Amino acid sequence: MVVYSSTEKKRIRKDFGKRPKVLDIPYLLSIQLNSFQKFIKHDPNGIHGLESAFRSIFPIRSYNGNSELQYINYKLGQPIFNVKECQTRGMTYSSPLRVKLRLVIYEKETLDITVKDIKEQEVYMGEIPLMTTNGTFIINGTERVVVSQLHRSPGVFFDSDKGKTHSSGKVLYNARIIPYRGSWLDFEFDPKDNLFFRIDRRRKLPISIILKALNYNTEQILDTFFKKNIFKFTENSILMKLVPHRLRGETASFDICIDNKTYIKKGQRITARHINILKEKKIHTIKVPTEYLIGKISAKNYFNKKTNEIIVSANTELNINIIKELKNNEYTNIETIFTNDLDHGPYISETLNIDPTHDKLSALVEIYRMMRPGEPPTREAAENLFENLFFSEERYDLSSVGRMKFNRSLQKQNITERGVLNQSDIISVIKKLIDIRNGHGEIDDIDHLGNRRVRSVGEMAENQFRIGLIRVERAVKDRLSLGDLDMLMPQDMINAKPISAAIKEFFGSSQLSQFMDQNNPLSEITHKRRISALGLGGLTRERAGFEVRDVHPTHYGRVCPIETPEGPNIGLINSLSVYAQTNSYGFLETPYRKIHNGKVTNEIKYLSAIEEGNFIIAQANTNLDETGAFVEDLITCRYKGESSLFNKNQINYMDVSTQQIVSVGASLIPFLEHDDANRALMGANMQRQAVPTLRSEKPLVGTGMERAVAVDSGVTIIAKRGGIVQYVDASRIIIKVKKNEINSEEAGIDIYNLKKYTRSNQNTCINQIPCISLGENVEKGNVLADGPSTDLGELALGQNMRVAFMPWNGYNFEDSILISEKVVQEDRFTTIHIQELACISRDTKLGSEEITSDIPNVGEAALSKLDESGIVYIGAEVNGGDILVGKVTPKGETQLTPEEKLLRAIFGEKASDVKDSSLRVPNGVLGTVIDVQIFTRDGVKKDKRALEIEEMQLKQAKKDLTEEQKVFELGLFTQIKSTLINSGMNIDQLNKIPKSELFKVKVTNNLYQKKIHKLFLKYEELKKCFNKKLETTRNKITQGDDLAPGVLKIVKVYLAVKRHIQPGDKMAGRHGNKGVISKINPIEDMPYDQNGLPVDVVLNPLGVPSRMNIGQILETHLGLASKGLGNIIDTMLKQQKSILNIRKFIQKAFNLGNNTRQKTNLNNFSDDEILSLAKNFKNGIPISTPVFDGAQESEIKALLKLADLPSSGQITLFDGRTGEKFERPVTVGYMYMLKLNHLVDDKMHARSTGSYSLVTQQPLGGKAQFGGQRFGEMEVWALEAYGAAYTLQEMLTVKSDDVNGRTKMYKNIVDGNYKMEPGMPESFNVLLKEIRSLAINIELENE
């Protein structure tokens, strides 16, 4: 049986899922929170976070070694302001970082080093931004999210150019060693098969140079990379030591005879058969002619034994003279390198031939010249440079991930070694690269998720912090070397600015620190779970090819194949799948059920993409019997990225859930399995743009993910502990905690404050509404209050609309949507938008700006909504152009004419020294002022309104704290009373004692006396805490604000704008079916059914077939059934049918269909619970149809039948205007529709007289500039085609850039003279000037 929480009991979703729920959906924000926790948490091993950064930089030694600064530990202080205060004040929510440092000064006496002095001190090292409980940061008052980055994992990668580089189409292989920190090292073949290396993508050098720099000589190089052929000189012949398989594929250049028998004739190709014969005969040497030796390459240096002169150096081709000389010098054995064209190419040998260097020093010098061109190389400089490139821990680090990937790639057993490279590493990489070129081994797939890892917030912040510390390190080193250390303390060494600057830069302007998308809870959660391939150290849009963006088999269960933006970022920005998480190395992993002896168990194992490749994995929708064994013998499984059929005994793992492969956004689309992928992508993206409506309504057809999203997003209020609701109003909920959940020394009261009408990042409204009632019992984890777009703890992005699929007079042409006036009247899609408008008063050169109600040249009417301080009242309804905050700016002294001087002298008018620069309501905005905030600089006198606001805030704070204290005191007194009663005291006696005296009562039982004493201490502590809180709050409210330089005062006005739905607004369903409202039709004109019920929305049926999103039709049918069942329950309630009948009917609906997952026995519910359930079911029984495991067609039909509706889902409709029946039944049902944040009010505007461009004098474009409509060249052609010469002339002159003409025309209109006189357009003058700038003079002749 399914166990429901008390919130779920209020409204159960009928679940059509067939597969059992093996694994609960993990906390959806864990990727953000865990990563940041790792960063700030103290790590004793020093592998992660701040500790790792400090340990990697400290101790800092002076250049002469006389002193060093050591790191001991760090601690993060408490943030001064809480999240809400930081948002209103425009501050960063952060805590101070204090680090304990030790300065040690040494005394160098002869050889011994003794400690002269030790000083310890705690040093302030800047502020570290903190993450809020919802995984965001408050930076300068705005909520931001740091998106995780998918970047190429450190390690070694073998790749090829796929034959694209060289014209011949030859495939060139390369290897690249990528460290976490340090220089990249590349090895590559050129078209002539020589091997080269590059450092940091600079000029390439032959690979032998790096080998010589590693102290290898030519002999050692050949010895390392080649096998040897050994030839023995006898008196009259040459014998070759035979290794039979090396002859394969060669053409014999001589007869191969053994015991006078010829086995292989000259010119014959040596095959495997010949080699087997040679092996069988156990022949170890064969006789070869001298010619066979000519052209072979010597593997060693051979010297003249008498003169010690070199006869032949290693890597030299042998010729007849060299062979003779070797014989003369009595060499019996000669070694040559073994190469062939098949699988042992002579690459290194040929590369040595083009290498200009001859020893280690010349190789180092060559590397130095390549890295630092133009600088004269010295031996020491060259050695240091090479040493620091790859072998110094300060400059180079593969990291534990890089080392693991590196050693795995080279098949080394040990995966933990140092982070720097060594000789054997470089040799191993070159060997593997040569093997790949020789046809052994495969290249890596760089888009495989085993080669790409996720870098989350914590790691990026740590890297940034380390950069700041490195800057500090340089300064400290210089400071330590200056002497006079006796007077200095660690504090004097450290300047926190570079660290703060690095952190600030990252959180403020990094490409991955983004302004949070806060349209609705889903967009918040998706933004935090986003994974981007862009950003520092990642890809750029321009360079990213098709392969990187494409869906890869390893994305399965890790990255969503559906949710990604349309446009230039497609495939580069992805979303994490529902169950995916990162492992300790940063690779994405996904859970699977383990299979033991052919039976699927509930044991869960997380596998990364690398591990997954070795297993055969069955899909989640595979049929199992009761014991967990597979029903079929052959099952579709995935193995190494391919799907095929496998025997059931071969399978190792099985998927956990059908929604494992998709992201949170896509898992909210019901019947996703019936939608085309492109439309599903649009659907997932558009859900994030839905604006929270005035009253949220749960979807009738959901997927069961709605609750998880709403709860995890943090917009709802969740009970921390169970208990009874003691008090509830619109802004506060108080819960008396259950006894078994109370700690012994506390009052047992939980207070929850609700957010009321605050503004989101996207200007939508955030408002929390309690969804529990007084005296209700709540459990831990229950939803206490709904936030924006949530309904009883479920995500509710839109509204359930009664839709009909039919054409209606062309009003739904091209995806347009026809809606009924009823939708507007019922405020179904009315949304509240909150705009923040700020007025800043600055100190200017001419004097300071002033906020006042005394504004020059403004009538009384315009000032009617302002108070005496010049600031608008709260509650005032304002229109476009109204003054919100009166402000005057000093004007520069202008030269006055004598007449003006005279007037000034007579009337004494001085007010014209200032100009009006008031804050006005933007054009086209109509709203109500809901809040005003005033921030005044320290030392500037506060105006009357500011003092009023301050007083009000203090009153409110005091009231809140007093109420809070009262509640806690009540809790304590209740505990004391129960203790005294338990000790044997009479209740009547107790009631006579005043509360304040209760603590003084003495009881005989020592245990109870101790408990009372403890409670008394708690009471005293509570009082102290209350006074302290009050004092802190008072200080925060009364102190001046920290404003930017030159700013005296900031007034912020918040306007609430109510937007009804209107033609031009964009709406969409959840299946990528979007459209614009074309007309709002009167209710009486809408099509209606035989009961007279009109439809709300008419959609075009032609929008379905070509788009292939059939999910919307199935949703409509299921929605109809759901609503039909709701209507039946509603009728039963109205007819006051017995609760038994209602229980039976709801049970019947729940039992319908093959829903093994949801077995609900309503007999366990009380009558009250059934009644509450039925009331919530009046508008339809909510249904959940999980993705890839949803309702079948037969189940939908059965549900329609139960609701007494036609099983086709089609109904006869009548035309609202004529009353005539439409000629065929129409698909009618309920679809969940969203209103998207693309409102016509934000897009449409009309220009009167506005601003003009400076050079061309043409009107500007765009709403922000109050611009006009562009009349482009195509429009000009159109008028030319019609021969409308005068209209064209008007467009190109007076309506555009004929300055005199347009002024004249304005005057003429005022005078009532409707004539126009076109003049010379300004753009023509610009053209003249441009031609003159080419030294061609053009003069205009006057007629």
From Swiss-Prot:
Q: List its EC numbers.
A: 2.7.7.6
Top-rank taxon of the source lineage equals Bacteria
Q: Report the coiled-coil segments.
A: none
Carries keyword Nucleotidyltransferase? Answer: yes
The UniProt entry, under Gene3D superfamilies, shows: 2.40.50.100, 2.40.50.150, 3.90.1100.10, DNA-directed RNA polymerase, beta subunit, external 1 domain, DNA-directed RNA polymerase, subunit 2, domain 6, RNA polymerase alpha subunit dimerisation domain, RNA polymerase Rpb2, domain 2
InterPro entries to which the protein is assigned, alphabetical: DNA-dir_RNA_pol_bsu_ext_1_sf (IPR042107), DNA-dir_RNA_pol_bsu_external_1 (IPR019462), DNA-dir_RNA_pol_su2 (IPR015712), DNA-dir_RNAP_su2_dom (IPR007120), DNA-dir_RNAP_su2_hyb_sf (IPR037033), RNA_pol_bsu_bac (IPR010243), RNA_pol_bsu_CS (IPR007121), RNA_pol_bsu_protrusion (IPR007644)
One GO biological-process annotation of the entry reads: DNA-templated transcription
- Could you describe the subunit structure of this protein? The RNAP catalytic core consists of 2 alpha, 1 beta, 1 beta' and 1 omega subunit. When a sigma factor is associated with the core the holoenzyme is formed, which can initiate transcription.
Q: What does it do?
A: DNA-dependent RNA polymerase catalyzes the transcription of DNA into RNA using the four ribonucleoside triphosphates as substrates.
**Could you tell me what this protein is called?**
DNA-directed RNA polymerase subunit beta
From which source organism is this entry?
Answer: Buchnera aphidicola subsp. Baizongia pistaciae (strain Bp)
Gene this protein is translated from: rpoB
